[in-house]
Regions:
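Divalent metal-cofactor coordination and adjacent catalytic microenvironments
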Residues: 31-108
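Polybasic, proline/glycine-rich intrinsically disordered low-complexity segments
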Residues: 105-138
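Conserved short "hinge" loops at termini or chain/domain junctions
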Residues: 1-65, 127-134, 139-153
Length: 153
């Protein structure tokens, strides 16, 4: 059974707020989020499913992804979003948000907070990825560390 990209997008959209997305059409949102998919796939290097088995025209993976796999992929997409929109862009230094609810008093402090948030997301997702890898090893009957014996002197 196939997994549509839309499942990833739905999971991802609930994790962040963007001022641009409400102004976009559904197709524009899909195109925008699709840009974060390929880097997310390359980061998910221990996936037990073949993430390259996909149809970009039909916007789906040709395999069924579990909820954990969808969560890991959408988290990596979120990290890619933060990287591209905030971390790797010089426009961060020219922040002009019209919202009266959110004011930036120090761009340097704001950047520090963004970097801390980014690091937190990466750490949390790497932990989830490690658990996913361990679950796969356990399900496969692989005994990690088996066969290695310390010699006593």
């Amino acid at each position: 059974m196939a997994t549509p990209y839309e499942k990833l997008y739905e999971n991802l959209l609930s994790k962040f707020r963007s001022y641009e997305i409400p102004l976009m059409t559904v197709e524009e949102v899909k195109d925008y989020l699709y840009d974060f998919l390929a880097p997310a796939i390359s980061r998910f290097h221990v996936c037990r499913k073949n993430l390259n088995d996909r149809d970009d025209i039909l916007q789906r993976f040709n395999v069924e992804l579990s909820d954990v796999e969808i969560e890991i992929l959408s988290n990596y997409m979120l990290i890619e979003y933060i990287d591209s929109e905030y971390v790797r862009t010089p426009s961060l230094l020219k922040i002009q948000l019209p919202s009266s609810d959110f004011k930036v008093y120090s761009p340097a402090n704001f950047l520090d907070k963004l970097m801390a948030m980014h690091k937190t997301y990466v750490t949390e997702n790497e932990t989830l990825l490690s658990r996913y890898a361990w679950m796969g090893a356990k399900e496969s009957g692989i005994k990690l560390g088996a066969g290695y014996k310390k010699s006593k002197f």
